[in-house]
């Protein structure tokens, strides 16, 4: 069994909590700020998608293969790493089918937002919060275990997930705010959904801490890589394309990949 210091655990949990709290930031944009610039939102979503795809394929999947190789051999390491990567995508596909994530964020300009239709809006807000909360559990696990093994990988991933969480906070806050006219309720609903990430991380660690090994790390990282790639391709990039009015999606995608690539190089040189 691998030994993990309590300092690393608390660091990983803090990073995961910070990423989850970004949903609250999204709700603040609804209740206090003006309507967000759709082109900037498109760029930000694509940036997060590019960052998540790059770090998943270049670092997390490689760590899965390396961990399996240390536990077995190079041939089995590559095989098991690939299989768990595909298994991660299959897992999140099943979750997505059982608890569909609302891909179309509601807008304050939507004709559904009328004073005589608050019951409908309240139901939409509840369903949106439940769906996004369910999807936040695997994201919390991804951030936690990536940071636990290597902050150089976990922190950039947490940054990408935090960007991804901002529009999720907006998606929850819009129907709640217009159903209740209460800023506190809108902020609280978004924040509680984001807290699913550190809660999911804590539950995952408690379940796996007694059996942590190279093989377990390999399986966790393989699944995480698959989940992150699926989320980027299924949620972030399509959402970015919806808001884009030009080439913001491809510019954001390339910028996200480039930024993560440079940050990982700098982390390598900064490491002792």
From Swiss-Prot:
InterPro entries: ZIP, Zn_transptr_ZupT
Topology with respect to the bilayer: Multi-pass membrane protein
One Gene Ontology cellular component: plasma membrane
Binding site for Fe(2+): 136, 139, 165, 168, 197
Pfam families documented for this protein: Zip
Major place of residence: membrane
GO molecular function terms listed in the Swiss-Prot or TrEMBL record: metal ion binding; zinc ion transmembrane transporter activity
Keywords recorded for this protein, A-Z: Cell inner membrane, Cell membrane, Ion transport, Iron, Membrane, Metal-binding, Transmembrane, Transmembrane helix, Transport, Zinc, Zinc transport
GO biological process: one example: zinc ion transmembrane transport
Signal peptide annotation: none
HAMAP family reported for this sequence: ZupT (MF_00548)
Family: Belongs to the ZIP transporter (TC 2.A.5) family. ZupT subfamily.
PANTHER family membership: ZINC TRANSPORTER ZUPT, ZINC/IRON TRANSPORTER
Function text: Mediates zinc uptake. May also transport other divalent cations.
Full protein name: Zinc transporter ZupT
Gene, per the UniProt record: zupT
């Amino acid at each position: 069994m691998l030994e993990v210091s309590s300092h690393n655990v608390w660091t990983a949990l803090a990073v995961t909590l910070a990423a989850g709290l970004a949903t609250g930031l999204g709700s603040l944009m609804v209740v206090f700020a003006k309507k967000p610039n759709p082109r900037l939102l498109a760029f930000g979503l694509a940036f997060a998608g590019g960052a998540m795809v790059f770090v998943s394929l270049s670092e997390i999947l490689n760590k899965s293969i390396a961990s399996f190789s240390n536990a077995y051999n190079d041939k089995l390491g590559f095989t098991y790493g690939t299989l768990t990567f595909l298994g991660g995508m299959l897992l999140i596909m099943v979750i997505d089918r059982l608890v569909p994530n609302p891909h179309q964020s509601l807008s304050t300009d939507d004709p559904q937002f009328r004073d005589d239709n608050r019951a409908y809006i309240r139901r939409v807000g509840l369903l949106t919060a439940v769906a996004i909360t369910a999807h936040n559990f695997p994201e919390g696990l991804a951030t936690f275990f990536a940071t636990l093994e290597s902050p150089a990988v976990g922190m950039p991933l947490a940054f990408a997930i935090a960007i991804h969480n901002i529009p999720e906070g907006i998606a929850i806050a819009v129907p709640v705010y217009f159903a209740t006219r209460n800023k506190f309720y809108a902020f609280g609903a978004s924040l509680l959904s984001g807290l699913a990430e550190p809660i999911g991380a804590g539950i995952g660690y408690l379940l796996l801490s007694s059996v942590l090994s190279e093989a377990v790390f390999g399986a966790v990282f393989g699944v995480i890589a698959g989940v992150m790639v699926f989320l980027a391709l299924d949620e972030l990039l399509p959402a970015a394309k919806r808001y884009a009015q030009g080439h913001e999606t491809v510019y954001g995608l390339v910028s996200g990949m480039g930024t993560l690539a440079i940050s990982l190089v700098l982390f390598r040189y900064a490491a002792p």
